[in-house]
């Protein structure tokens, strides 16, 4: 199932309009640190920055049968410490059931097996219960909480829940996750 139909591929310039339309959806913006509507110019500048030598990130499009469904971002990549931060979202509301689980599995496999990272770090706004459960379901462990870390116009200050996932955890849990995904197919 995972080998042939689902994949992460590098984000390309041709993806920018689609990714911008996803990123500007209210449901996605509300889960981000910055929730303003992003202009095409701002989005293009961001993408140009990601293409520069020395940029510390990687950005992927998550696809099913070559059809884009979402985005996975790796930022603050430290080769020295073998650590990165991740972010993600499904942009297609009609994505098949289980798509988010496959996306998470592929992202973790990319980080730990292809990029040889030791740790993946996630940060989730306290009011994003779906993402909090998602991180736990994938095997992330809560490592801390940044109190009143982000200000949102409607909610005021929000805590940020910090998650970590170590490569040794991945080695223990990846087959369990893969088996669960195979059962969904």
Predicted segments, located by residue:
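Conserved GNAT-fold acetyl-CoA-binding loop/helix
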Residues: 27-47
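A short helix-loop-beta-strand connector motif used in the catalytic cores of GNAT acetyltransferases and
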Residues: 48-61, 70
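An amphipathic alpha-helix signature
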Residues: 13-20, 40, 44, 48
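Acyl-donor (CoA/ACP) binding surface of acyl/acetyltransferases
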Residues: 1-18, 22, 63-185
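Short, hydrophobic secondary-structure boundary micro-motifs
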Residues: 30-32, 59, 173
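Juxtamembrane/interface motifs at transmembrane-helix termini
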Residues: 38-41, 50-52, 90-91, 180
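Alpha-helix C-capping/helix-to-loop hinge sites
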Residues: 29-31, 50, 93, 149
């Amino acid at each position: 199932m995972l080998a042939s139909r689902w994949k992460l591929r590098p984000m390309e310039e041709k993806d920018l309009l689609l990714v911008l339309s996803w990123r500007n959806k209210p449901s996605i913006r509300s889960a981000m640190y910055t929730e303003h509507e992003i202009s095409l110019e701002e989005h293009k500048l961001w993408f140009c920055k990601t293409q520069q030598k020395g940029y510390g990130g990687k950005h992927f499009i998550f696809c099913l049968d070559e059809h884009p469904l979402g985005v996975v971002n790796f930022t603050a990549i430290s080769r020295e410490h073998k650590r990165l931060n991740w972010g993600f979202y499904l942009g297609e509301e009609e994505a098949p059931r289980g798509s988010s689980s496959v996306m998470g599995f592929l992202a973790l496999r990319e980080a730990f097996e292809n990029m040889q990272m030791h740790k993946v770090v996630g940060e989730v706004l306290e009011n994003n219960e779906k993402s909090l459960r998602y991180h736990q379901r994938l095997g992330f462990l809560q490592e801390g909480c940044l109190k009143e870390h982000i200000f949102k116009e409607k909610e005021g200050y929000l805590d940020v829940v910090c998650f970590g996932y170590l490569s040794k955890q991945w080695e223990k849990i990846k087959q369990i996750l893969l088996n669960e995904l195979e059962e969904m197919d």
